[in-house]
Amino acid sequence: MSNDWIFGACAVPDARMRSAALARQEQLTKPPGALGRLEQLAVQVAAWQRTEHPAVQRVWIAVYAADHGVAAEGVSAFPQAVTGEMVRNFARGGAAIAVLARELGARLEVVNLGVVNDPGDLSRVRRAWIAPSTANICEQPAMTATQLRDALAAGAHSIAQAKSCDTQLFVGGEMGIGNTTAAAALGCALLSQFPQALAGAGTGLDAEGIAHKVTVITRALALHADASTPLERLRRLGGFEIAALVGAYIAAAQAGIPVLVDGFIATAAALVATRLNPGVREWLLFGHRSQERGHAALLRALDAEPLLQLDLRLGEASGAAVAIPLLRSACALHNGMATFAEAGVSDA
């Protein structure tokens, strides 16, 4: 299997349903625009779903776990063993995203792409093993071509499963010690930014730790300066879980499944996905603005205005999950409010 599928055409939102939804908003018992962005969200979901009655009840959340070779450079406040330990925590339902998924009634898929502290087979974890970790990006490319292909395909597999369940919204999350370093390096390469602009605290680095992370990213960028395409930059600087998110976003757009993007790492993956296949952008909505330093720059590059700003920096799809009730409220208002004619209320 090649990577050619990632360049395939994306679905197109329904312009007729967008117009119909806009027309309904104008007739609801409220001043025009009084519900602000909630009105825009309802219209957007209606166009995505090709329906006059948009809904965000069937939600698929996929969390991809993978380790990074660059962790050997000391770029995280936590040991690498945490990635595997968190996979167990996801499976047991103790992680933040597991709690949120239960609260939302969402399907939670956890995918183990390769961790150093391997928990083995777990009943609630899909094993899509590639390697114990990527290679150290300061020494060599993060992935081989085959590993990149497999990681992209792992994300696409999630979408195939989600589509079979008639999913109305896909949310991608990640877990991997060292992945803010990989995401920052990838963002720098794609946006021609200096590492100081994108490298942040990650799991809780102090100023000295962030300065060291900047040095590590600078070394990685110098080593891979000849990577000239988004796909090659992903292969050299990314991670298994970042590539899986890229594959999931592209496959979702091709399948016509809306995507709610999480924080810094998920947004780095979204940037790669849109560079590889520009049609993906129409299917992306951004859940929140992370506290991670580089997130704002990535959002600007995508012309994205996130729904929330709560100073989150956990990952796991947690910030996007917190935004889902806003989408549900937008749809409920759109579907349930009376029109002026129905309510016998005078229009302006």
Curated annotation (Swiss-Prot):
The alphabetical list of record keywords is: Cobalamin biosynthesis, Glycosyltransferase, Transferase
- Kindly identify the residues recorded as the active site: E316
- Is-annotated flag, keyword Glycosyltransferase? yes
Tell me the SUPFAM superfamilies matching this sequence: Nicotinate mononucleotide:5,6-dimethylbenzimidazole phosphoribosyltransferase (CobT)
According to its UniProt record, the EC number is 2.4.2.21
Gene3D superfamilies, alphabetized: 1.10.1610.10, 3.40.50.10210
The pathway entry for this protein reads as: Nucleoside biosynthesis; alpha-ribazole biosynthesis; alpha-ribazole from 5,6-dimethylbenzimidazole: step 1/2
Q: Note the SS bond partners.
A: none
Biological function: Catalyzes the synthesis of alpha-ribazole-5'-phosphate from nicotinate mononucleotide (NAMN) and 5,6-dimethylbenzimidazole (DMB).
- What name is this protein filed under? Nicotinate-nucleotide--dimethylbenzimidazole phosphoribosyltransferase
Native species of this protein?
Xanthomonas oryzae pv. oryzae (strain PXO99A)
